[in-house]
């Protein structure tokens, strides 16, 4: 807890915030701590990323590593669109330095759910689950935006789903952050159809 200008507040340290601010770092964190995540590759150079993209047969999501105003995640419909998105991020620097590194991951189908969790390093407490509306058009169509809104609680966040999230994602994340000396968590999850 910090007191700045007389306002009591709390939040993640800069080191902990890296889990939200760097997609490559958070994917490696999940892998290191055996937390379920989509199949992925992290890339620092365009040619390696391009070759990886050519080698996969599944639909992908391409993510700029850094913060890009909520617009750095591209879900291409075709391999050509994927190559275009990769080129725009890494060669044309569409998102500036945020796209110097990218994650190319398997596209998972399902409903997305956000869970904001607080912890002292052992106990976990979560706010009601929320569902974001990131796309620019109705019906979850169009490109992602910086945020079109959300609502909570969401009906997809059933008691059973939340218990599974706590058991397989939240608690292992807290345990991993404690082992790494970092604590705070915001989870954006996809429940598979």
What kind of region is each of these model predictions?
Residues 7-10, 28-36, 64-71, 143-158:
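Acidic/polar active-site rim loop that often engages polyanionic ligands
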Residues 18-24, 137-138:
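Short, charged, surface-exposed secondary-structure boundary motifs
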Residues 72-193:
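Internal nucleotide-binding/catalytic subdomain
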Residues 2-5, 15-16, 48-49, 81, ...:
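Catalytic-core regions of core metabolic enzymes
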Residues 10-11, 38, 61, 103-105:
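Structural detector of well-ordered beta-strand residues that form the stable sheet scaffold
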Residues 1-21, 35-42:
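A short, GP-enriched loop/loop-strand-helix hinge that lies immediately N-terminal to
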Residues 21-52:
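Short, glycine-/small-residue-rich phosphate/pyrophosphate-handling segment
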Residues 57-79:
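Conserved anion/nucleotide-ligand pocket segment
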């Amino acid at each position: 807890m910090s007191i700045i200008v007389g306002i009591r507040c709390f939040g993640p340290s800069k080191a902990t915030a890296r889990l939200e601010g760097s997609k490559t770092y958070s994917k490696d964190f999940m892998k290191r701590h055996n937390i379920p995540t989509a199949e992925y590759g992290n890339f620092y150079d365009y040619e390696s990323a391009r070759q990886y993209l050519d080698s996969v047969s599944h639909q992908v999501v391409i993510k700029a590593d850094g913060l890009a105003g909520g617009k750095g995640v591209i879900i291409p419909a075709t391999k050509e669109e994927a190559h275009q998105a990769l080129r725009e991020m890494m060669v044309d620097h569409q998102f500036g330095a945020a796209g110097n590194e990218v994650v190319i991951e398997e596209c998972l189908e399902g409903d997305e759910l956000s869970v904001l969790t607080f912890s002292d390093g052992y106990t976990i407490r979560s706010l009601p689950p929320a569902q974001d509306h990131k796309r620019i058009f109705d019906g979850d169509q169009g490109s992602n935006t910086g945020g079109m809104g959300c609502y909570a609680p969401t009906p997809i966040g059933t008691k059973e789903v939340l218990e599974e999230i706590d058991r397989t994602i939240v608690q292992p994340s807290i345990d991993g952050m404690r082992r790494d000396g970092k604590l705070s968590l915001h989870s954006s999850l996809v429940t598979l159809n």
